[in-house]
């Protein structure tokens, strides 16, 4: 659950958690001043700012006057992160507030792959457990991503992979043993790892996160060293609506951009006949780059850019 629950009311924005309206002063420069409402629950301030920026998309920044907020530990922590008492939307959403643990960091060394003749940064170790958690006020659900576990996820994953809708695009139906072995292989790969997406801690989707340079897509475009890519499927029928797709697609892109601050672009390469997915990609910040052929499918390459995502798309 959210620590704030900011909603629209007849008199402006209201916090259900505090059971009072927010004292917001609206400026002429697409900014606002949020006056301190008093004693706050743990985690309230960041949740409130996140939801204010969504409830009032015209806002470019929210000021938290230091003289009012200087006794509030949550505000002081935030001031230290942004080096100001003015919280800009684009900078705020790039803080690692929604990472479940600090992102892994690589050594900084470079690696040469002689077989593929590519030279790229050494990648960090695969993360463990949950990697991202954020309350999405648009759908009033908690979105989270965690590393897939062959022990607890194999039966569910097998059911998803044998769904005709999924099998049509993934071409990977098979027994429980086959799917368990597949998940285990994904957990030992050097350039990719598997995630399970959850709404309110209920699994609904499967994603594979990879470094584009080392993936098959790297042969088909001019990659940058920290480009990230993803494969995806939604396994549970109840979570297939457009509003849910926008939630997890933006959330997953957000995670990739937070996990590695040097990542400027995220890419996908869905089959060209996956028309339903393409309808959702542009609103989430993805634009078509080109179409090309893999040995097993014709694909469309789509890409999201960090600057465009945080300035024009958002969460």
Language-model segments: what does each one mean?
Residues 1-10, 174-194:
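Active-site rim helix/loop that mediates acceptor-substrate recognition in acyltransferases
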Residues 1-11, 108-151:
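Conserved N-terminal entry element of GNAT/NAT acetyltransferase domains
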Residues 21-25, 196, 202-212:
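Conserved beta-strand in the GNAT
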Residues 42-52, 241-257, 279:
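Conserved acetyl-CoA-binding loop-helix of GNAT-fold acetyltransferases
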Residues 141-173:
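Short amphipathic alpha-helix that is part of the acyltransferase structural core
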């Amino acid at each position: 659950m959210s620590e704030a629950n900011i909603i629209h009311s007849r008199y402006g924005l209201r916090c259900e958690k505090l059971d009072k309206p927010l004292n917001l002063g609206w400026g002429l420069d697409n900014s606002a001043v949020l006056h301190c409402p008093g004693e706050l629950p743990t985690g309230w301030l960041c949740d409130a700012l996140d939801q204010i920026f969504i409830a009032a998309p015209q806002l470019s920044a929210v000021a938290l006057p230091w003289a009012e907020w200087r006794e509030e530990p949550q505000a002081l922590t935030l001031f230290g992160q942004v080096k100001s008492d003015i919280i800009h939307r684009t900078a705020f959403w790039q803080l690692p507030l929604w990472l479940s643990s600090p992102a892994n960091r690589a050594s900084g060394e470079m690696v040469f792959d002689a077989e593929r003749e590519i030279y790229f940064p050494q990648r960090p170790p695969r993360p463990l457990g949950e990697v991202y958690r954020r309350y999405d006020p648009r759908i009033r659900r908690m979105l989270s991503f965690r590393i897939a576990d062959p022990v607890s996820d194999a039966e569910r994953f097998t059911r998803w992979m044998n769904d005709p809708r999924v099998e049509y695009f993934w071409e990977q139906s098979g027994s429980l043993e086959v799917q368990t072995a597949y998940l285990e292989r994904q957990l030992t790969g050097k350039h990719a790892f598997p995630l399970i997406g959850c709404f309110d801690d209920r699994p609904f989707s499967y994603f594979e996160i990879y470094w584009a340079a080392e993936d098959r897509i790297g042969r088909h475009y001019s990659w940058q060293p920290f480009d990230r890519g993803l494969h995806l499927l939604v396994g549970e029928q109840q979570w297939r609506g457009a509003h849910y797709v926008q939630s997890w697609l933006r959330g997953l892109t957000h995670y990739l951009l937070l996990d590695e601050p040097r990542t400027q672009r995220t890419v996908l390469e869905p089959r060209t006949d996956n028309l339903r997915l393409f309808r959702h990609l542009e609103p989430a910040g993805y634009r078509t780059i080109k179409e090309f052929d893999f040995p097993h499918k014709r694909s469309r390459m789509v890409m999201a850019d960090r600057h465009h995502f945080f300035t024009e798309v958002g969460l």
